[in-house]
Amino acid sequence: MFKKLLLLVVGLLVVGGIVAYPKLKQLQVVTPAYQVPGQLVKLEQGWSEAQRTQFHHTAQGTRLVPYDWFLALEQPCFLGCEPFAKQEYLGRFGFLAGDSDSKLNPDGLPVGLARQTDFSDPVSGKTYAVVGLSCAACHTGELHYKNYAVRIEGGGAMMQPTEVQKALGIALVMTEKLPWRYSKFAEKVLGPKASEADRKQLKAEFGAFIEKAKSDLTKVQSRNIYPNDAGFGRTDALTRIGNQVFGGAMNNWDNWAQGNAPVRFPQVWDSSWFTWVQYNSSIADPLVRNIGEALGVRAAAKLYGPDAKEFKNSVNMNGLKTLEDLLCGPEPYAGLRSPKWPSVFPALDAAKVAQGATLYEEHCAGCHLPSIEKLKADLGSATPKYWVSNSSGKRFLDLLDVQVVDVGTDGRAALDFVARTADSGDLGKGRISAGVALELVTKGIRDQYFMRAGFSAEQKTEWMGYREENAEAVRSKPIYKARPLNGAWAIAPYLHNGSVPSLYEMLASKEQRGTPVFWLGNKQFDPVKVGYEQKEFEGGTRFDYSLPGNSNSGHWFQDGPRGRGVVGPALTDAKRWALVEYLKSL
Protein backbone atom coordinates (compact mmCIF):
# COMPACT_ATOMS: atom_id res chain seq x y z
CA MET A 1 0.00 0.00 0.00
CA PHE A 2 1.27 3.45 -0.87
CA LYS A 3 1.79 5.63 2.17
CA LYS A 4 1.56 9.37 2.74
CA LEU A 5 3.30 10.83 5.75
CA LEU A 6 1.08 13.66 6.97
CA LEU A 7 2.15 15.44 10.13
CA LEU A 8 -0.70 16.55 12.38
CA VAL A 9 -0.16 20.27 12.11
CA VAL A 10 -2.50 21.54 14.81
CA GLY A 11 -1.26 19.12 17.42
CA LEU A 12 2.34 19.75 16.50
CA LEU A 13 1.94 23.51 16.74
CA VAL A 14 0.28 23.17 20.13
CA VAL A 15 2.76 20.68 21.53
CA GLY A 16 5.93 21.93 19.93
CA GLY A 17 5.40 25.50 18.86
CA ILE A 18 7.09 24.80 15.54
CA VAL A 19 7.46 28.05 13.62
CA ALA A 20 9.66 27.04 10.70
CA TYR A 21 6.82 25.28 8.87
CA PRO A 22 3.76 27.56 8.95
CA LYS A 23 1.90 25.91 6.07
CA LEU A 24 0.42 22.43 5.82
CA LYS A 25 2.39 21.66 2.67
CA GLN A 26 5.63 22.31 4.53
CA LEU A 27 4.67 19.72 7.14
CA GLN A 28 4.08 16.98 4.59
CA VAL A 29 6.54 14.45 3.31
CA VAL A 30 4.90 12.64 0.43
CA THR A 31 6.76 9.66 -0.96
CA PRO A 32 5.92 6.51 -2.87
CA ALA A 33 5.92 3.20 -1.07
CA TYR A 34 9.32 1.55 -0.93
CA GLN A 35 10.00 -0.11 -4.28
CA VAL A 36 11.44 -3.41 -3.14
CA PRO A 37 14.22 -4.39 -5.54
CA GLY A 38 14.26 -7.85 -7.05
CA GLN A 39 17.37 -9.91 -7.68
CA LEU A 40 20.28 -7.49 -8.01
CA VAL A 41 22.01 -7.64 -11.39
CA LYS A 42 25.45 -6.02 -11.57
CA LEU A 43 26.71 -5.33 -15.07
CA GLU A 44 30.34 -5.43 -16.15
CA GLN A 45 31.43 -1.80 -16.14
CA GLY A 46 35.13 -2.13 -15.37
CA TRP A 47 34.89 -2.02 -11.57
CA SER A 48 35.60 -4.64 -8.94
CA GLU A 49 33.29 -5.05 -5.94
CA ALA A 50 35.73 -3.05 -3.83
CA GLN A 51 35.73 -0.23 -6.36
CA ARG A 52 31.93 -0.14 -6.46
CA THR A 53 31.87 0.19 -2.68
CA GLN A 54 34.47 2.95 -2.80
CA PHE A 55 32.36 4.93 -5.24
CA HIS A 56 29.17 4.38 -3.26
CA HIS A 57 30.52 5.48 0.13
CA THR A 58 33.65 7.64 -0.20
CA ALA A 59 33.16 10.98 1.56
CA GLN A 60 33.79 14.18 -0.36
CA GLY A 61 33.57 16.63 2.52
CA THR A 62 29.84 17.34 2.53
CA ARG A 63 27.61 17.57 5.59
CA LEU A 64 23.96 16.87 6.23
CA VAL A 65 24.13 16.47 10.02
CA PRO A 66 26.55 15.05 12.59
CA TYR A 67 26.84 11.31 12.07
CA ASP A 68 25.62 10.18 15.49
CA TRP A 69 22.60 12.47 15.20
CA PHE A 70 21.67 10.88 11.89
CA LEU A 71 21.77 7.38 13.37
CA ALA A 72 19.76 8.49 16.41
CA LEU A 73 17.01 10.34 14.54
CA GLU A 74 13.60 8.79 14.02
CA GLN A 75 11.32 9.22 11.04
CA PRO A 76 8.96 12.24 11.15
CA CYS A 77 5.98 10.69 12.93
CA PHE A 78 4.61 10.61 16.50
CA LEU A 79 4.46 7.05 17.81
CA GLY A 80 6.26 3.83 16.94
CA CYS A 81 8.72 5.69 14.74
CA GLU A 82 11.54 3.70 13.20
CA PRO A 83 15.06 5.01 12.52
CA PHE A 84 15.35 7.70 9.87
CA ALA A 85 18.39 5.90 8.42
CA LYS A 86 16.47 2.69 7.72
CA GLN A 87 16.83 1.57 4.10
CA GLU A 88 13.10 0.92 3.68
CA TYR A 89 12.45 4.56 4.57
CA LEU A 90 15.26 6.25 2.65
CA GLY A 91 14.51 3.94 -0.26
CA ARG A 92 11.16 5.68 -0.63
CA PHE A 93 13.07 8.79 -1.67
CA GLY A 94 14.99 6.70 -4.20
CA PHE A 95 18.13 5.79 -2.26
CA LEU A 96 19.54 2.39 -3.25
CA ALA A 97 20.63 -0.28 -0.79
CA GLY A 98 24.25 0.30 0.19
CA ASP A 99 27.25 -1.95 0.53
CA SER A 100 28.36 -3.68 3.70
CA ASP A 101 31.84 -2.48 4.58
CA SER A 102 33.28 -2.22 8.08
CA LYS A 103 35.43 0.79 7.19
CA LEU A 104 33.50 2.80 4.62
CA ASN A 105 29.93 1.95 5.62
CA PRO A 106 29.84 0.33 9.07
CA ASP A 107 26.16 1.13 9.67
CA GLY A 108 24.79 -0.03 6.34
CA LEU A 109 23.69 3.33 4.95
CA PRO A 110 22.30 3.57 1.40
CA VAL A 111 24.38 4.26 -1.69
CA GLY A 112 25.47 7.89 -1.77
CA LEU A 113 25.51 8.49 1.97
CA ALA A 114 29.04 8.68 3.33
CA ARG A 115 30.50 8.86 6.82
CA GLN A 116 33.42 11.22 7.38
CA THR A 117 35.06 11.12 10.80
CA ASP A 118 37.34 14.14 10.28
CA PHE A 119 34.97 16.75 8.84
CA SER A 120 36.53 20.15 9.54
CA ASP A 121 34.10 23.06 9.81
CA PRO A 122 35.82 26.15 8.34
CA VAL A 123 33.60 28.53 10.32
CA SER A 124 33.73 27.03 13.82
CA GLY A 125 37.09 25.31 13.43
CA LYS A 126 35.68 22.14 14.98
CA THR A 127 36.37 18.64 13.67
CA TYR A 128 33.76 15.92 14.09
CA ALA A 129 32.03 13.01 12.33
CA VAL A 130 29.26 13.77 9.83
CA VAL A 131 27.08 12.08 7.27
CA GLY A 132 26.99 13.70 3.86
CA LEU A 133 25.91 13.10 0.30
CA SER A 134 28.44 11.76 -2.17
CA CYS A 135 28.26 11.82 -5.96
CA ALA A 136 26.99 8.22 -5.97
CA ALA A 137 23.65 9.36 -4.51
CA CYS A 138 22.73 11.05 -7.79
CA HIS A 139 24.91 9.04 -10.17
CA THR A 140 23.95 5.42 -9.46
CA GLY A 141 20.87 4.13 -11.23
CA GLU A 142 18.70 1.06 -10.91
CA LEU A 143 16.21 -0.33 -13.43
CA HIS A 144 13.52 -2.72 -12.22
CA TYR A 145 12.30 -5.31 -14.72
CA LYS A 146 10.23 -8.34 -13.75
CA ASN A 147 12.00 -9.74 -10.67
CA TYR A 148 15.35 -8.07 -11.42
CA ALA A 149 16.98 -4.84 -10.24
CA VAL A 150 19.66 -3.88 -12.77
CA ARG A 151 22.28 -1.62 -11.17
CA ILE A 152 23.72 1.12 -13.41
CA GLU A 153 27.00 2.42 -12.00
CA GLY A 154 27.45 6.06 -13.00
CA GLY A 155 23.90 6.37 -14.31
CA GLY A 156 21.31 8.90 -13.23
CA ALA A 157 19.50 8.04 -9.99
CA MET A 158 15.71 8.10 -9.73
CA MET A 159 15.89 9.78 -6.35
CA GLN A 160 14.65 12.99 -4.76
CA PRO A 161 17.37 14.72 -2.70
CA THR A 162 15.39 17.85 -1.81
CA GLU A 163 12.47 15.89 -0.36
CA VAL A 164 14.69 13.72 1.82
CA GLN A 165 16.38 16.85 3.16
CA LYS A 166 12.93 18.26 3.88
CA ALA A 167 12.04 15.09 5.78
CA LEU A 168 15.32 15.32 7.67
CA GLY A 169 14.54 18.91 8.64
CA ILE A 170 11.08 18.01 9.94
CA ALA A 171 12.51 15.07 11.89
CA LEU A 172 15.06 17.38 13.51
CA VAL A 173 12.45 19.96 14.49
CA MET A 174 10.11 17.32 15.89
CA THR A 175 12.99 15.90 17.91
CA GLU A 176 13.76 19.31 19.36
CA LYS A 177 10.15 20.18 20.22
CA LEU A 178 8.69 16.87 21.40
CA PRO A 179 10.19 15.89 24.78
CA TRP A 180 9.74 12.13 24.44
CA ARG A 181 11.52 12.14 21.09
CA TYR A 182 14.37 14.28 22.33
CA SER A 183 14.94 12.08 25.39
CA LYS A 184 15.33 8.99 23.21
CA PHE A 185 17.54 10.90 20.77
CA ALA A 186 19.86 12.25 23.48
CA GLU A 187 20.29 8.83 25.08
CA LYS A 188 21.22 7.29 21.73
CA VAL A 189 23.75 10.05 21.03
CA LEU A 190 25.29 10.33 24.50
CA GLY A 191 24.52 6.99 26.13
CA PRO A 192 22.54 6.43 29.36
CA LYS A 193 25.30 7.60 31.70
CA ALA A 194 26.03 10.99 30.12
CA SER A 195 26.95 13.85 32.41
CA GLU A 196 24.74 16.87 32.86
CA ALA A 197 27.38 19.00 31.14
CA ASP A 198 27.31 16.74 28.08
CA ARG A 199 23.51 16.88 27.99
CA LYS A 200 23.53 20.68 28.14
CA GLN A 201 26.14 20.87 25.41
CA LEU A 202 24.16 18.58 23.11
CA LYS A 203 20.98 20.56 23.76
CA ALA A 204 22.74 23.82 22.91
CA GLU A 205 24.41 22.46 19.76
CA PHE A 206 21.22 20.79 18.57
CA GLY A 207 19.20 23.95 19.12
CA ALA A 208 21.75 26.16 17.39
CA PHE A 209 21.89 23.81 14.39
CA ILE A 210 18.11 23.91 14.01
CA GLU A 211 17.87 27.68 14.46
CA LYS A 212 20.43 28.19 11.69
CA ALA A 213 18.52 25.79 9.43
CA LYS A 214 15.22 27.56 10.19
CA SER A 215 16.73 30.95 9.43
CA ASP A 216 18.14 29.77 6.12
CA LEU A 217 14.87 28.07 5.17
CA THR A 218 12.87 31.21 5.90
CA LYS A 219 15.15 33.29 3.69
CA VAL A 220 15.00 30.77 0.84
CA GLN A 221 11.21 30.63 1.01
CA SER A 222 10.76 34.40 1.27
CA ARG A 223 12.77 34.80 -1.93
CA ASN A 224 10.96 31.91 -3.68
CA ILE A 225 14.36 30.53 -4.64
CA TYR A 226 13.21 27.15 -5.96
CA PRO A 227 9.74 27.53 -7.55
CA ASN A 228 10.18 24.47 -9.78
CA ASP A 229 9.89 21.26 -7.76
CA ALA A 230 12.44 19.25 -9.70
CA GLY A 231 11.09 16.01 -8.24
CA PHE A 232 12.57 12.58 -8.83
CA GLY A 233 15.72 12.25 -10.90
CA ARG A 234 16.47 15.96 -11.35
CA THR A 235 18.00 19.01 -9.70
CA ASP A 236 18.92 22.55 -10.73
CA ALA A 237 22.59 21.75 -10.33
CA LEU A 238 24.35 24.91 -11.47
CA THR A 239 21.96 27.25 -9.67
CA ARG A 240 22.26 25.27 -6.45
CA ILE A 241 26.05 25.21 -6.69
CA GLY A 242 26.05 28.96 -7.28
CA ASN A 243 23.70 29.58 -4.37
CA GLN A 244 25.81 27.54 -1.97
CA VAL A 245 29.04 29.20 -3.15
CA PHE A 246 28.05 32.81 -3.90
CA GLY A 247 25.30 32.97 -1.29
CA GLY A 248 26.10 30.62 1.57
CA ALA A 249 29.90 30.51 1.51
CA MET A 250 30.20 34.25 0.75
CA ASN A 251 27.56 35.03 3.40
CA ASN A 252 25.59 37.20 0.97
CA TRP A 253 21.89 36.51 0.52
CA ASP A 254 21.70 39.02 -2.33
CA ASN A 255 23.82 36.58 -4.35
CA TRP A 256 21.14 33.90 -4.24
CA ALA A 257 19.40 33.30 -7.57
CA GLN A 258 16.10 31.69 -8.41
CA GLY A 259 16.39 28.13 -9.66
CA ASN A 260 14.27 27.56 -12.76
CA ALA A 261 16.42 25.09 -14.67
CA PRO A 262 16.29 21.56 -13.25
CA VAL A 263 18.27 18.96 -15.19
CA ARG A 264 18.28 15.20 -14.94
CA PHE A 265 21.17 13.55 -13.14
CA PRO A 266 23.60 12.81 -15.99
CA GLN A 267 25.58 9.67 -16.68
CA VAL A 268 29.24 10.10 -15.74
CA TRP A 269 31.07 7.34 -17.63
CA ASP A 270 33.74 8.63 -20.05
CA SER A 271 33.19 12.27 -19.04
CA SER A 272 36.61 12.61 -17.38
CA TRP A 273 38.12 12.55 -20.86
CA PHE A 274 35.79 15.10 -22.47
CA THR A 275 37.19 18.52 -23.30
CA TRP A 276 34.27 20.12 -21.41
CA VAL A 277 31.59 18.71 -19.12
CA GLN A 278 28.18 19.76 -17.77
CA TYR A 279 25.17 19.96 -20.08
CA ASN A 280 26.13 23.52 -20.97
CA SER A 281 29.75 22.56 -21.64
CA SER A 282 30.92 24.90 -18.89
CA ILE A 283 33.69 23.11 -16.93
CA ALA A 284 36.97 21.61 -18.15
CA ASP A 285 39.16 20.77 -15.12
CA PRO A 286 37.79 17.63 -13.37
CA LEU A 287 39.07 18.74 -9.97
CA VAL A 288 37.40 22.13 -10.36
CA ARG A 289 34.22 20.32 -11.41
CA ASN A 290 34.30 18.02 -8.39
CA ILE A 291 35.05 20.82 -5.93
CA GLY A 292 32.05 22.72 -7.27
CA GLU A 293 29.86 19.63 -7.03
CA ALA A 294 30.92 19.03 -3.42
CA LEU A 295 30.16 22.65 -2.51
CA GLY A 296 26.77 22.32 -4.18
CA VAL A 297 25.78 19.42 -1.91
CA ARG A 298 26.86 21.16 1.27
CA ALA A 299 30.57 20.99 1.63
CA ALA A 300 31.34 24.04 3.76
CA ALA A 301 33.50 27.01 2.84
CA LYS A 302 34.21 30.38 4.44
CA LEU A 303 34.64 33.02 1.75
CA TYR A 304 33.98 36.15 3.77
CA GLY A 305 35.80 38.21 6.37
CA PRO A 306 39.48 39.15 6.55
CA ASP A 307 40.51 35.54 5.88
CA ALA A 308 38.27 35.08 2.82
CA LYS A 309 41.21 34.67 0.45
CA GLU A 310 42.46 31.70 2.44
CA PHE A 311 39.54 29.74 0.91
CA LYS A 312 38.94 27.72 4.07
CA ASN A 313 36.74 24.73 3.29
CA SER A 314 35.72 21.21 4.26
CA VAL A 315 36.17 19.59 0.84
CA ASN A 316 37.77 16.15 1.16
CA MET A 317 40.33 16.45 -1.62
CA ASN A 318 41.66 12.93 -1.17
CA GLY A 319 38.11 11.64 -1.43
CA LEU A 320 37.57 13.58 -4.65
CA LYS A 321 40.81 12.15 -6.07
CA THR A 322 39.72 8.62 -5.19
CA LEU A 323 36.34 9.11 -6.87
CA GLU A 324 37.81 10.70 -9.98
CA ASP A 325 40.42 7.95 -10.35
CA LEU A 326 37.63 5.38 -10.25
CA LEU A 327 35.73 7.19 -12.98
CA CYS A 328 38.55 8.09 -15.35
CA GLY A 329 41.12 5.33 -15.11
CA PRO A 330 44.63 5.92 -16.47
CA GLU A 331 43.44 6.36 -20.06
CA PRO A 332 40.13 6.86 -21.91
CA TYR A 333 37.79 3.88 -21.54
CA ALA A 334 39.99 2.36 -18.80
CA GLY A 335 37.86 3.58 -15.87
CA LEU A 336 34.11 3.28 -15.45
CA ARG A 337 32.62 1.90 -18.65
CA SER A 338 29.11 2.34 -19.98
CA PRO A 339 26.77 -0.60 -19.34
CA LYS A 340 25.75 -3.09 -22.01
CA TRP A 341 22.14 -4.16 -22.56
CA PRO A 342 21.67 -6.90 -19.95
CA SER A 343 20.75 -10.48 -20.72
CA VAL A 344 17.75 -10.32 -18.36
CA PHE A 345 16.10 -7.84 -20.77
CA PRO A 346 14.49 -9.00 -24.03
CA ALA A 347 17.08 -9.98 -26.64
CA LEU A 348 17.98 -7.46 -29.32
CA ASP A 349 16.77 -7.85 -32.91
CA ALA A 350 19.98 -8.13 -34.96
CA ALA A 351 18.34 -7.02 -38.21
CA LYS A 352 16.90 -3.90 -36.60
CA VAL A 353 20.24 -3.15 -34.93
CA ALA A 354 21.98 -3.28 -38.32
CA GLN A 355 19.35 -1.03 -39.91
CA GLY A 356 19.58 1.36 -36.97
CA ALA A 357 23.38 1.54 -37.25
CA THR A 358 23.06 2.91 -40.77
CA LEU A 359 20.42 5.41 -39.67
CA TYR A 360 22.62 6.50 -36.75
CA GLU A 361 25.52 7.29 -39.07
CA GLU A 362 23.16 9.29 -41.29
CA HIS A 363 21.23 11.25 -38.69
CA CYS A 364 23.01 11.16 -35.30
CA ALA A 365 26.78 10.72 -35.60
CA GLY A 366 27.30 14.24 -36.92
CA CYS A 367 26.54 15.59 -33.44
CA HIS A 368 26.88 12.61 -31.10
CA LEU A 369 30.01 11.18 -32.79
CA PRO A 370 30.41 7.61 -34.05
CA SER A 371 30.39 4.44 -31.98
CA ILE A 372 32.82 3.88 -29.12
CA GLU A 373 34.65 1.27 -31.20
CA LYS A 374 35.40 3.90 -33.85
CA LEU A 375 36.35 6.47 -31.23
CA LYS A 376 38.77 4.00 -29.64
CA ALA A 377 40.37 3.34 -33.02
CA ASP A 378 40.64 7.08 -33.65
CA LEU A 379 42.25 7.59 -30.22
CA GLY A 380 45.19 5.47 -31.33
CA SER A 381 45.57 7.21 -34.67
CA ALA A 382 48.57 9.39 -35.46
CA THR A 383 46.20 12.10 -36.70
CA PRO A 384 42.97 11.68 -34.73
CA LYS A 385 39.75 13.25 -36.00
CA TYR A 386 37.83 13.38 -32.73
CA TRP A 387 40.54 13.81 -30.09
CA VAL A 388 42.70 16.80 -29.14
CA SER A 389 45.91 16.95 -27.11
CA ASN A 390 47.43 19.44 -24.70
CA SER A 391 50.89 19.88 -23.21
CA SER A 392 50.44 16.82 -20.96
CA GLY A 393 50.40 14.58 -24.01
CA LYS A 394 47.00 13.14 -23.09
CA ARG A 395 44.14 13.13 -25.57
CA PHE A 396 40.63 14.37 -24.85
CA LEU A 397 37.41 13.80 -26.77
CA ASP A 398 36.38 17.04 -28.45
CA LEU A 399 32.60 17.14 -28.20
CA LEU A 400 30.36 19.22 -30.42
CA ASP A 401 28.85 22.31 -28.81
CA VAL A 402 25.44 23.25 -30.23
CA GLN A 403 23.88 26.69 -29.91
CA VAL A 404 20.70 26.68 -27.81
CA VAL A 405 18.80 28.39 -30.61
CA ASP A 406 19.76 25.62 -33.04
CA VAL A 407 18.93 22.54 -30.97
CA GLY A 408 15.80 24.31 -29.70
CA THR A 409 15.64 22.60 -26.32
CA ASP A 410 14.73 24.46 -23.14
CA GLY A 411 17.38 27.13 -22.81
CA ARG A 412 17.20 28.04 -19.14
CA ALA A 413 19.98 25.76 -17.90
CA ALA A 414 22.45 27.40 -20.28
CA LEU A 415 21.08 30.92 -20.46
CA ASP A 416 20.58 31.38 -16.71
CA PHE A 417 24.25 30.56 -16.13
CA VAL A 418 25.29 33.01 -18.86
CA ALA A 419 23.19 35.80 -17.35
CA ARG A 420 24.06 35.23 -13.70
CA THR A 421 26.49 37.47 -11.84
CA ALA A 422 27.73 37.54 -8.26
CA ASP A 423 29.24 40.08 -5.89
CA SER A 424 32.61 38.56 -4.98
CA GLY A 425 32.59 40.42 -1.66
CA ASP A 426 35.72 39.98 0.41
CA LEU A 427 37.42 38.07 -2.40
CA GLY A 428 37.88 41.52 -3.90
CA LYS A 429 36.92 41.07 -7.56
CA GLY A 430 33.75 43.16 -7.52
CA ARG A 431 30.67 41.97 -9.42
CA ILE A 432 31.65 39.25 -11.85
CA SER A 433 29.95 36.62 -13.99
CA ALA A 434 28.93 33.32 -12.44
CA GLY A 435 31.49 31.50 -14.55
CA VAL A 436 34.33 33.74 -13.44
CA ALA A 437 33.17 33.60 -9.82
CA LEU A 438 32.93 29.81 -9.80
CA GLU A 439 36.40 29.50 -11.32
CA LEU A 440 37.78 31.98 -8.79
CA VAL A 441 36.48 29.93 -5.86
CA THR A 442 37.13 26.41 -7.12
CA LYS A 443 40.62 27.23 -8.37
CA GLY A 444 41.28 29.07 -5.12
CA ILE A 445 40.37 25.98 -3.10
CA ARG A 446 42.37 23.78 -5.47
CA ASP A 447 45.47 25.96 -5.44
CA GLN A 448 45.44 26.43 -1.66
CA TYR A 449 45.38 22.65 -1.29
CA PHE A 450 48.23 22.22 -3.77
CA MET A 451 50.30 24.80 -1.90
CA ARG A 452 49.72 23.25 1.54
CA ALA A 453 50.46 19.78 0.19
CA GLY A 454 53.66 20.95 -1.49
CA PHE A 455 52.75 19.39 -4.83
CA SER A 456 55.20 19.27 -7.70
CA ALA A 457 54.14 20.39 -11.18
CA GLU A 458 53.68 16.75 -12.16
CA GLN A 459 51.44 16.04 -9.17
CA LYS A 460 49.31 19.08 -9.90
CA THR A 461 48.85 17.97 -13.50
CA GLU A 462 47.77 14.50 -12.43
CA TRP A 463 45.26 15.83 -9.88
CA MET A 464 43.81 18.22 -12.48
CA GLY A 465 43.07 15.31 -14.80
CA TYR A 466 46.04 16.26 -16.99
CA ARG A 467 44.60 19.68 -17.75
CA GLU A 468 46.85 22.73 -17.83
CA GLU A 469 47.02 24.70 -14.58
CA ASN A 470 46.40 28.13 -16.07
CA ALA A 471 43.91 27.06 -18.74
CA GLU A 472 40.31 28.28 -18.61
CA ALA A 473 38.44 25.93 -16.27
CA VAL A 474 34.94 27.43 -16.26
CA ARG A 475 33.07 29.25 -19.02
CA SER A 476 29.50 30.35 -19.71
CA LYS A 477 28.08 30.20 -23.23
CA PRO A 478 24.56 29.71 -24.67
CA ILE A 479 25.32 26.14 -25.74
CA TYR A 480 24.62 22.51 -24.95
CA LYS A 481 27.08 19.72 -25.64
CA ALA A 482 26.31 16.60 -27.64
CA ARG A 483 27.99 13.57 -26.11
CA PRO A 484 28.35 10.00 -27.44
CA LEU A 485 25.30 7.81 -26.82
CA ASN A 486 26.92 4.64 -25.46
CA GLY A 487 24.74 3.53 -22.56
CA ALA A 488 21.95 5.91 -23.59
CA TRP A 489 19.40 3.14 -23.07
CA ALA A 490 20.07 3.30 -19.30
CA ILE A 491 19.65 7.02 -18.65
CA ALA A 492 15.96 7.92 -19.06
CA PRO A 493 14.31 10.42 -19.02
CA TYR A 494 15.84 12.31 -21.93
CA LEU A 495 16.97 15.77 -22.99
CA HIS A 496 19.05 17.67 -20.47
CA ASN A 497 15.98 18.50 -18.38
CA GLY A 498 14.44 15.03 -18.41
CA SER A 499 11.35 16.23 -20.25
CA VAL A 500 11.09 13.33 -22.71
CA PRO A 501 10.29 10.01 -21.02
CA SER A 502 11.64 7.50 -23.56
CA LEU A 503 14.09 6.99 -26.41
CA TYR A 504 11.22 6.31 -28.80
CA GLU A 505 9.74 9.74 -28.07
CA MET A 506 13.15 11.36 -28.54
CA LEU A 507 13.00 10.47 -32.24
CA ALA A 508 9.68 12.22 -32.86
CA SER A 509 8.53 15.33 -34.66
CA LYS A 510 7.07 18.23 -32.71
CA GLU A 511 3.53 17.04 -33.37
CA GLN A 512 4.29 13.40 -32.53
CA ARG A 513 5.95 14.28 -29.25
CA GLY A 514 3.30 16.64 -27.96
CA THR A 515 3.19 17.18 -24.20
CA PRO A 516 2.04 13.86 -22.75
CA VAL A 517 1.47 13.61 -19.01
CA PHE A 518 4.04 11.38 -17.37
CA TRP A 519 5.26 10.69 -13.85
CA LEU A 520 8.76 10.34 -12.44
CA GLY A 521 9.84 8.14 -9.56
CA ASN A 522 8.81 4.67 -10.69
CA LYS A 523 11.85 2.46 -11.29
CA GLN A 524 9.95 -0.06 -13.41
CA PHE A 525 11.66 -0.14 -16.79
CA ASP A 526 10.04 -0.37 -20.21
CA PRO A 527 12.55 -2.14 -22.50
CA VAL A 528 10.45 -1.51 -25.61
CA LYS A 529 10.19 2.28 -25.71
CA VAL A 530 13.23 2.42 -23.41
CA GLY A 531 12.34 4.48 -20.37
CA TYR A 532 10.68 4.24 -16.99
CA GLU A 533 7.00 3.47 -16.52
CA GLN A 534 5.13 6.72 -17.03
CA LYS A 535 1.78 6.08 -15.31
CA GLU A 536 0.51 8.11 -12.38
CA PHE A 537 1.27 6.69 -8.95
CA GLU A 538 0.91 8.08 -5.46
CA GLY A 539 3.98 9.91 -4.25
CA GLY A 540 5.49 10.30 -7.72
CA THR A 541 6.37 13.53 -9.51
CA ARG A 542 3.99 14.73 -12.21
CA PHE A 543 6.06 16.35 -14.93
CA ASP A 544 4.58 19.82 -15.48
CA TYR A 545 5.53 21.32 -18.85
CA SER A 546 4.08 24.69 -17.86
CA LEU A 547 6.85 25.35 -15.33
CA PRO A 548 9.93 27.33 -16.36
CA GLY A 549 12.75 25.02 -17.38
CA ASN A 550 10.44 22.09 -18.17
CA SER A 551 9.84 22.50 -21.90
CA ASN A 552 10.24 19.38 -24.04
CA SER A 553 10.76 21.38 -27.20
CA GLY A 554 13.55 20.83 -29.70
CA HIS A 555 15.64 17.94 -30.98
CA TRP A 556 12.80 17.12 -33.39
CA PHE A 557 12.97 14.87 -36.41
CA GLN A 558 10.80 16.42 -39.11
CA ASP A 559 11.11 17.55 -42.69
CA GLY A 560 12.10 21.10 -43.49
CA PRO A 561 15.07 23.36 -42.74
CA ARG A 562 17.49 22.30 -40.00
CA GLY A 563 17.96 24.44 -36.93
CA ARG A 564 15.54 26.07 -34.51
CA GLY A 565 14.81 22.71 -32.95
CA VAL A 566 14.92 20.48 -36.03
CA VAL A 567 17.92 18.11 -35.99
CA GLY A 568 16.96 15.56 -38.63
CA PRO A 569 14.36 14.49 -41.19
CA ALA A 570 11.02 12.93 -40.39
CA LEU A 571 11.44 9.24 -39.56
CA THR A 572 8.98 6.51 -40.36
CA ASP A 573 7.84 4.44 -37.42
CA ALA A 574 9.95 1.54 -38.67
CA LYS A 575 13.05 3.74 -38.75
CA ARG A 576 12.36 5.06 -35.25
CA TRP A 577 12.13 1.52 -33.89
CA ALA A 578 15.32 0.52 -35.73
CA LEU A 579 17.19 3.46 -34.21
CA VAL A 580 15.87 2.58 -30.76
CA GLU A 581 17.12 -0.99 -31.22
CA TYR A 582 20.56 0.22 -32.27
CA LEU A 583 20.80 2.59 -29.31
CA LYS A 584 20.02 -0.35 -27.03
CA SER A 585 23.10 -2.07 -28.42
CA LEU A 586 25.52 0.76 -27.59
Regions found by a protein language model. Name each.
Residues 8-16:
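Core hydrophobic alpha-helical transmembrane segments of single-pass membrane proteins
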Residues 4-5, 17-586:
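Periplasmic c-type cytochrome electron-transfer domains
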